[in-house]
Structure formats: structure tokens, C-alpha cells
Amino acid sequence: MSDKSYLKWPFFEQRHRALEGVLDAWAAEHVSQEHGRDVDEACRTLVRSLGASGWLAHAIGGIAYGGASDVIDTRTICLIRETLARYSGLADFAFAMQGLGSGAITLFGSEAHKQRYLARIVRGEAIAAFALSEPQAGSDVAAMQCAAVQDGDHYVLDGEKTWISNGGIADFYVVFARTGEAPGARGISAFIIDAGTPGFEIVERIDVIAPHPLARLKFTGCRVPASSRLGDAGQGFKVAMATLDVFRTSVAAAALGFARRALDEALERAMTRKMFGQTLADFQLTQAKLAQMATGLDAAALLTYRAAWQRDQGERVTKEAAMAKMTATETAQQIIDAAVQMFGGLGVVSEHPVERLYREIRALRIYEGATEVQQLIIAREILRNREPSGDAPTKA
């Protein structure tokens, strides 16, 4: 059983601790790492199950639309992702994409948008997607080429999106396109586009190291009502960054879940595997490795739940979320690699729990901003907040 002493930290309220306990019991009964080859159907099934059991109520903000509260509680999102990730990467993915795909609607949607989409998300009746990346514009959002030209009370979209999670199974997509109000990032707007809209097609399904629904999208003369725009024209970059600020911290939490499962597997292995007349755990080398794994996990968790707590206090957490995402994913990679090593040859057998975790975490170090992008964000934030002293160095 995983160490849950972190739940005693002051970042959490009693409601968070109670929720984690209920979810852990639910996941133990309803979530399996085995989902077969059809990840599309497995993902749909997980979304329906998460909706029917009430967990998707935490993915949106708005009690009027079925949400658990009027605002998205970041600590709750993080605890749910960490707990689900301990059991199944696909279950974590299914929950997370419902939140990320609809997050822009929670934050910037009109009343009509919220009425139409959020309640369906909560019930697990609709699947959401967040379409930002392009073939030539991943981390560099300002280089976006997909364009939306206004034509009366409609916009006409042309261009492509790629690496879109839930691509091919989503019922609607939050799509970002260049509308030209200003150069660079200030000339982007966000739109809600339903699957099946004429001029919108899925042109490629993408297979990746940790299987989940992923696709390349193409828009060719795709007409959408101007009323489908989220926020004001030219506000798309703000919409994207605000949404990512909420959910980037939760990526760190998913990494914690993977790492915690790996540590659990490693501890069990160390205590039961015998060689040279003693268990692995009796060797000082093994003890040192386990100590490093546990310490790294706690350090990453402290950064993650600090960022979540700060965001729930209404603070801007661009730097803190980047620190959490970078540290948790990189640390989890190290912990999982150490667990694989502890299992020896068994650790690289396909579908072994630690082999599966190894594939899951490698992708997470890239999704929603690679480690190198997080480093740039952190550096930009600390440089922005530092005033030059103005003192010239003295000569000896």
C-alpha cells in the first residue's frame, strides 16, 4: 500500500483527504491497467465510468452545470490524477483530458457554451479535446499557422493541428487559430468546434509509446459561427495559458502517481526477492537507492502541492507550475528507471507494471510543455521579477 503521509501536509483540507480515500477505494475496484488493444473504446468506457461515479464533476467549475464547486479546485484535480495514475495511465489520461479540453469553457465560455458542453462532460456523455499544437508550432505558440478569417457572423478555418489528445474520439475540440488582430501571440483566438463540422477531418491517427487516442486534424474552409469563439478576438493566447496554468500542475501530480506506484513495486521487490542468502532490501546499495527514490518523490510532491495550493488561493502560478511539472516528471523518470533496474530482466518484459510505467513517464516529460520549455518559463519569470541593483562592480 502506498505511503499516504503526504496527505497530512498543511496544503490539504479534510475534504481533500476524504476524497482521496474514497477515490482510492473506487479505483481499486473499477480501474485496471489492462485495457486491451482498442484504446479508443477503453477511453470511452473510462470516461463513462468516471462520469457515472461523479469524478468528472471535479473536472469543471460551475455547480449549475453539474460541477462539484463553482471554481476548479486544483488540489482536488491533482489528487485525482495522482490516485488514478497509480492504477492506470489511461484512466488518468481520460480524466485529465476531460478537464483540459473543457477548461477553457469553464474559464472563458459564455453561458450558452457552459450550458451546452459542461453538463455533458460531467456525465461522461461527451469527450473533449484541446487543439493547440501544430506540425511547425508546438511549444512556440506564436508561430501558429492555422488561420480563422471572419466572414460576417462566421469564421472560416484553414490549417492543421497535430499531437491532439482525444483526437478522433472527441465530440468537440477547443481549437486555437490565428485571427490577425495583432502580430504573434496577440493575434490568436479560441473556438469550440464540434466533431463532424463540414471542413473538419481527422487525417491521421498517431501511435505513441504509451497508447492513447492521438490524432492530426485538418481544417479546409471550415465555417464555424462567431458565437463559438471563446472570449474576445485576439484573446486565444490568454485562454490557452490560463487553461494550462490550471492543468500543468496536475501533470506533475500524474507523474507523482506513476512514481509512487514504481516505488511501491520496488519496495515489494526488494523485500521479497532473495539472492546470496538475503533479500535485496538487506543490501546497503538497495537501501541507498530506495532512500533516494523516496526523498525525490517527497521533494517533487512538495513542489506540486505548493503550486496547487497557491493556485487555489488565487495566486498566479506560472513559475510554480513549471517548477512542479519539470521536477515531478524528471524525478519520476529517475524513480521508475531505478525500479526497472531493481527488477532486472523482468522489468523490461512487455506489460510488466514497471515497464508500462517507464513508457508512461517518458511521454509525460514532453506533454504540455517539455522540460526544456519549463526551464525557459522559470528563467523568464525569475528574471522578470528581479530588479537590477544598479551597482557596478568595483575594481580591485
State each model region's role.
Residues 220-239:
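Long, acidic (Asp/Glu-rich), low-complexity accessory segments flanking structured domains
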Residues 127-149:
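A gly/ser-rich beta-alpha-beta helix-loop segment of oxidoreductase catalytic cores
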Residues 1-86, 108-113, 120, 124, ...:
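Alpha-helical interface subdomain recognition
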Residues 54, 81-85, 177, 193-197, ...:
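Short Ser/Thr-interspersed hydrophobic loop/turn segments at strand-loop and sheet-helix junctions
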Residues 154, 158-201:
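A short core secondary-structure module
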Residues 143, 196-225:
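Flexible, small-/acidic-enriched active-site or ligand-binding loops
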Residues 89-112, 138-141:
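N-terminal glycine-rich flavin-associated loop
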Residues 94, 136-139, 163-166, 180-182, ...:
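Short Gly/Pro-enriched turn/cap motifs at secondary-structure boundaries
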